[in-house]
Amino acid sequence: MGFDKAPSAVSKAKQNIINANLDEFIGVHHVNFFNSTKEVFGNTTILFNPPYGERLNIDVNEFYKKVGDTLKHNYPNSTAWMITSDMQALKHVGLRTSKRIELKNADLDCKFVKYELYEGTRKASKL
């Protein structure tokens, strides 16, 4: 599933998904992610390419905190992956990563991190 506040980004993403013959597996919605909730049963995988400080003029640390809060409260039993070049902001997500991969996105040094989200606590979810 994908979300974006920009209608043009949603339109382009939908067309790319159709061109790749993946439209039965991937949905993209014109929604503010921070107002969204998980709508399917079972594990959901979410991929993030959040705005970097270079791309938008926002309070990046607050933005990343809101991403973490939304994931924690609205997406139980899901997996989230995020690519970012802002290692300081990544600390504000407030969730523990289960995997970290260093890579390049164009000429930016980035990390691709994985978050495993549980209902309640991780310990309780394993019982």
Q: What is each of the regions a protein language model found here?
A:
Residues 1-127:
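Class I S-adenosyl-L-methionine-dependent methyltransferase catalytic core
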